[in-house]
Amino acid sequence: MTDVTVKSLAEEIQTSVDRLVQQFADAGIKKTETDFVSQKEKEALLAHLNREQGGSAGKPDKLTLQRKTRSTLNVSGTDGKSKPVAVEVRKKRTYVNRDAVEQAKAEEQAKREAEEQARREAEEKAQREAEAAAKKLVEEQAKREAEEKAKREAAEKAKRQAAESEKVTNQHTEHKQKPAQTDKTIQSEKARREAEAADLKRKAEEEMRRKVEEEAKRVAEEARRMAEENQDKWSSDSDSIDSDDYHVTTSRHARAAEDENDAKVEGDRRARGRSGKATRQKKNNKHSESKADREEARAVGRTKGKQRKTSTLQQSFNKPVAAVNRDVVIGETITVAELANKMAVKGSQVIKAMMKMGAMATINQVIDQETAQLVAEEMGHKVILRRENELEEALMSDRDTGEAVAEPRAPVVTIMGHVDHGKTSLLDYIRSTKVASGEAGGITQHIGAYHVETDSGMITFLDTPGHAAFTSMRARGAKATDIVVLVVAADDGVMPQTIEAIQHAKAASVPVVVAVNKIDKPEADPDRVKSELSQHGVQPEEWGGETQFINVSAKAGIGIDELLDAILLQAEVLELKAVRSGMASGVVIESFLDKGRGPVATVLVQEGTLNKGDIVLCGFEYGRVRAMRDELGREVFSAGPSIPVEILGLSNVPAAGDEATVVRDEKKAREVALYRQGKFREVKLARQQKSKLENMFANMEEGEVSELNIVLKSDVQGSCEAIREALEQLSTDEVKVKIIGSGVGGITETDATLAAASNAIILGFNVRADASARRVVENESLDLRYYSVIYSLIDEVKQAMSGMLAPEYKQQIMGLAEVRDVFKSPKFGAIAGCMVTEGTIKRNNPIRVLRDNVVIYEGELESLRRFKDDVNEVRNGMECGIGVKNYNDVRVGDMIEVFEIIEVKRSIA
């Protein structure tokens, strides 16, 4: 190993140079900062440091290492969105010195053996002492009895000797006479005394044996009592030994639960063991069979007396025998995987259930709430439908609506009618301005919102387009209005858009005031207008109805005051009121993207007061009102009910018809707007997927359908919606209009790139392309078209679609010839001699051979001759010879029909 300097070594081990030099000095090695350090010197320094830290005293018994690993995991939630979740994996590993552990176990074992030996010695000593005491007691008793017996025998002997001596003295003569009889008496007396002594000895031995047995019983009783008193201590020691064998977890609570489970299992085994069912139990539980045997075999060695302790480990899991019905909470949309997770079943089962119900889905497909409810109920679960707009409801409830005192407000009047019937001109005269001249083509293409002051009060007018493409804009105007003024030209009568306006007014339950315009024209016929409108449910007051009819002339100014009076009279009948104080709410009439000001929305305030600086939640968009302007472009700072204003400051262009609401918290408004965007997208995708799957067989033929891709940009949101709807209605079975992208504002480079990628044409309605977009258009040779009138746009799209239609081919009969005779030719076979009866017979045209007006062959001419000369055509009334290619069965009387196929150009109706 290469030697290193002291300085580099200090940097390597992350310590100061001075400290390292001092440690070398303490180890007996003198070093400076620039000196080299060899491997031996490093080992010497390490040994010195180990000695200082007590490393030589012995190795540590236990070493614990911890490691943390951090990562990020994307987890999908209940709303279907992926959220990054930080995951930290903590690993802990403990290394144990086996020598120390074995030594500790050996010491513990020796200690337990010593205690057991001491206990046994104590029992043996107590037993020996009891036996010695009993033996000593028996010996003393026997000694006392022997002494007493000896005294009694001595006294009796003395007494007998005295009696005998007296008897001997008195009967000396008799003894002398009978010596043989005296010897016999002495022997019998001696035998009697020996028998009495043996009997006394036997009785003493029996007494001693009885006392020894009683003492042994007493000692055994004391030993049993001692064992009962120390049983808890000894069993706890034994359990601590056994716990190392069958505890497989380190948690205290888990060990307690495991002990309870084992005790329960042991109780069941003892109850079943007597009936001989333990074997079947062991076979039924495959998980515990081998381990239970090992535990029982291990427990045999610990058996004491008649007590047995077995500890078995088995995982008691029983398969559910009945279906589990769950409460499934379903939001507005849910994926198939989430639905399966809530029902605790596999995703494949949910897909099978949906296929049985006639719906096809994939595991990650988003389905709507209704479909999910049907599937869950079909599978036997209880469904709880959840509304996921709690945040939105909380935000809407936290609004200051003031004291809720309703005050009279100005009526909102919508002017409807057929195109060119004079709606805008009538409004111009009322406002004394010239708005109609500013509209392209003289037709209204936006919703104009104006409020005018009259002598009788203020009136807010909404001018809607009359063109058929602006149906949604007229419907939107009817929803936001109080009174509809239906303008009908006296010289034109009721037209399709007039009927449509009546339907919108009836659907919105809005009263109608009919203004019969162009009354100054000579061909005007007001009675005809009344008659035609009465056929559609609009009855004039003169005929017993409820609708006011006012004859007006927008150019001459006839009947304008009467019309305003009729409007105000109708407003008085309606008793229109609104709350002026508090937070405002209204509806978006129109919206567009201004290049200098950003998103601009025309809002009609319906309740409250809209102030500059308020936070507005408008459909999918939100923002703070940075500026407000009236219809004349003047800046205003507040707007009350029935006042239309343009507001600036929204995050994007809102959709026309969205409800605009003032809220308190901008942060919550942003959350609600984002939630609405996501939910709208999910619901839209769910519906699209559902329609695609339901029309699966129809979609198989889509590859044969031509598509006209369009990128559409408009100046305002309402016009964009109207054009989009009109273009989509142009689609046919053969050519479909596909709107690749649409929006409000100028044509940008992004739009041009999108059109290039999708092979689409770019349509601009009252907008222009910027420089970068024009550059992309030139480089990619894209089709870019500008329009200012909707008629021209729709007509040109129709022409483009007509060019994409498959051509239609038509057969046109050129001539007819009758076969008069048949000749044989070695070169062409059968030659038909014919007379041309109609038209002209031309060479190389397809022909048909007819027999009895039935086509029997279709082919082409091979030879056409007149007087043995080849000719190109034969006119009517002339004879010729015709050779049919690959056909020789020509007969007299057949008709030969010559035709040609012409292409017919198709167009979109």
Swiss-Prot record:
Residues 417-424 are annotated as: G1. GO terms for molecular function: GTP binding; GTPase activity; guanosine tetraphosphate binding; translation initiation factor activity. GTP binds at residues 417-424, 463-467, 517-520. Keywords: Cytoplasm, GTP-binding, Initiation factor, Nucleotide-binding, Protein biosynthesis. It comes from the Bacteria. One of its GO terms (cellular component) is cytosol. Residues 49-314 are annotated as: Disordered. Residues 271-285 have a biased composition (Basic residues). PROSITE patterns: G_TR_2, IF2. Residues 99-177, 186-236, 255-270, 286-299 have a biased composition (Basic and acidic residues). PANTHER family: TR-TYPE G DOMAIN-CONTAINING PROTEIN (PTHR43381:SF5), TRANSLATION INITIATION FACTOR IF-2-RELATED (PTHR43381). One of the essential components for the initiation of protein synthesis. Protects formylmethionyl-tRNA from spontaneous hydrolysis and promotes its binding to the 30S ribosomal subunits. Also involved in the hydrolysis of GTP during the formation of the 70S ribosomal complex. This is Translation initiation factor IF-2. The lineage of its organism: Bacteria, Pseudomonadati, Pseudomonadota, Gammaproteobacteria, Enterobacterales. The gene is infB.
